[in-house]
Amino acid sequence: MKYILVTGGVISGIGKGIIASSIGTILKSCGLRVTAIKIDPYINIDAGTFSPYEHGEVFVLNDGGEVDLDLGNYERFLDINLYKDNNITTGKIYQHVINKERRGDYLGKTVQVVPHITDAVQEWVMNQAMVPVDGHKEEPQICVIELGGTIGDIEGMPFVEAFRQFQFKAKRENFCNIHVSLVPQPSATGEQKTKPTQNSVRALRGLGLSPDLIVCRSSTPIEMAVKEKISMFCHVNPEQVICIHDVSSTYRVPVLLEEQGIIKYFKERLDLPIGDSASSLLSKWRNMADRYERLQKTCSIALVGKYTKLRDCYASVFKALEHSALAINHKLNLMYIDSIDLEQTTEVEDPVKFHEAWQKLCKADGVLVPGGFGIRGTLGKLQAISWARSRKIPFLGVCLGMQLAVIEFARNCLNLKDADSTEFEPNARVPVVIDMPEHNPGNLGGTMRLGIRRTVFKTENSILRKLYGDVPFIEERHRHRYEVNPSLISQLEQKDLSFVGQDVDGERMEIIELANHPYFVGVQFHPEFSSRPMKPSPPYLGLLLAATGNLNAYLLQGCKLSSSDRYSDASDDSFSEPRLAELEIS
C-alpha cells in the first residue's frame, strides 16, 4: 500500500480537496486502484448537524455517512463509493479511544495524545485504506489522505504527529507528502510572493514532515524565477514545485498536474508499476476541459434555496447540473435566488431585492428547488414552484423541494388551503407531509433516513424511468425525516400528480411527475450525490434537456446521446441538433 498525504498551508480553502482528487484521478488513469481518506480536525463526530453556512453542504454516502463535501469530490473524480469511515474526525478518534479506555483495553495505563490518539489515527488509516471502494473485491493500491485545515492549527497537531510517526512505519518508498500552499500576488505590485510558502514549509518541517512536492496555488502561472526561489528555500528540486493557477474548470486540474510530470515523479518516488503516461481516462478529462472552455450555448437554471449566500451549500447540486449541461453541450448559467427574496414581506421591506429576484426567476429556462430544513423561506419556494407549474417551466424538486411541490399542488389544485407539513406546523389541519415513524425527536444527529435506498417504479409510462434506462427500480441516496402522507395519495393522483416511484414496501412516496407538463418532477432522494462527470444524474439531465427543449427528442432516440455529444471535441453545436431536426417532437 502506498500513502499520499496532502497537507495545506497559509490559508484553508485553497483547493486541497480538488488537488487530492486530481492526483487520485491521474493514478487511477495509470491503472492503479485508488481510495481516499479525508481528515477533519473538528471535534464533531460527523458533519450531520453542521449548519450549511458553517461547513458547506453535508455529503451523504451509500452507507448513510454524513461527511465533508470533499468526499463528494473524491467520489466524482475517482468514480468510487466511499464509506463513513473514510472521513476521520477528531470526535471519532477520541470517541474510539475513550470507548477502548472504558472497556479496559489499555489495561489501566494513562491514556494520552501520544501514543494512544496518534496510534488510533494510524490504525484507522491503515485499516480503511484496505477497504475496496470501486465495486471490486481487490484492495486499493494507493490511498490519498487529505488533512483538513492548515499546518500550525492546534486542532491538527495530533494528526501531524501521527503522520510524522507513520512515515517511518510505512517506509519512505510507501509514503509521500504533498504540501499545497498559496502564492499571493498583490494587485499593488503584481509580484508573486513566496514568503508565505516558505514559512508554511518551514512550519511543516519543524513538525517532522518534509514535503516531496509543493503545489503552489496562484491566480496566474508562477514564473520560473519564483519556482526556483521556492525550490531553494524549501529544500526541494525545481521539478518538485508544481503550479496550479486559477482555471475556468476543475476538469483542467488533473491535466495541469500531468503536464508537469507528476506521473513520472510518482513512478520513481513510490516505485509504482506504471508507465510514464496516463491512459485514455485522462484523455477524456482533457477533452472535457477543452470542451468546457469552448461551449457557446447557455442554459439558465434558477436555484431557489435558503442557503444561497455560500455556494458550497449546494456544491453537489451545482456539479450535477454542470455534468448534465456539459453532456448536452451547453454552458450552465446557475442563478442563485434566496427564496425569502420572492416573498411578499421582502416586497415591503426591500422592493429592489424582491423585483431582482423575480426577474431572475422569470428569465430562467428551468427551476430547481433543492433540499433543506426549517420553515424559513418556504413561502418563496412555494411561489417559485407555483410559477413553474402554472407556466409550464421545467421544474425539479429534490427532497424538501418535492415535499413543497406536493403541498403547493394540494393548496392550488385540490383547494386544500390548509395543506402543510408537520415540520412547519405540527398541528396542521391537512398534513400533506408527515414525520416518519422511526424518527426520534430527542436527538438530531443520526436520526434521519440516510443512505442508499431502493425506489421501485410503479408504472412504465414515466419520464424518470426512461431517463434511468427503463429499469424497474433504482437505488439513490436519501437524507430526510419527513415524507408525503400516504392517505392523501389517491386525491392527488386524481388531479394528475402521479407518484410513479415508491419504496420497496409501497409505503413511502419517492418520485412525483405531473401530467401535461414539459418536466415537473420531484424526488425524495438526493440524486446529485451519485452524479459523475461522465455519468450525469438522470433527474438533473432531464431538467437540462427540458430547459433546452430537447427532452422529447432525447426520449424518442432511446435516451442516448450521440457520439458527438459525450465529451468529444465537437462542441460548437448544442445537443445533437441535426438529428433533432429530423425527429418529430411530440
From Swiss-Prot:
Chain positions found as Phosphoserine: 568, 571, 574
Active site: 399, 526, 528
Swiss-Prot/TrEMBL keywords: ATP-binding, Glutamine amidotransferase, Ligase, Nucleotide-binding, Phosphoprotein, Pyrimidine biosynthesis
Glutamine amidotransferase type-1 domain mapped to chain residues: 300-554
Pathway listed: Pyrimidine metabolism; CTP biosynthesis via de novo pathway; CTP from UDP: step 2/2
GO CC term (a single one): cytoophidium
TM region positions: none
GO terms of molecular function: ATP binding; CTP synthase activity; identical protein binding
One biological process term in Gene Ontology: pyrimidine nucleobase biosynthetic process
EC numbers: 6.3.4.2
Pfam families tied to this protein: CTP_synth_N, GATase
Keyword Ligase annotated: yes
Positions of region (Disordered): 564-586
Enzyme class: ligase
Xref: CDD domains: CTPS_N (cd03113), GATase1_CTP_Synthase (cd01746)
SUPFAM superfamilies to which the protein is assigned, alphabetical: Class I glutamine amidotransferase-like, P-loop containing nucleoside triphosphate hydrolases
Protein family according to the UniProt entry: Belongs to the CTP synthase family.
Function: Catalyzes the ATP-dependent amination of UTP to CTP with either L-glutamine or ammonia as the source of nitrogen. Constitutes the rate-limiting enzyme in the synthesis of cytosine nucleotides.
Protein's recorded name: CTP synthase 2
Phylogenetic placement of the source organism: Eukaryota, Metazoa, Chordata, Craniata, Vertebrata
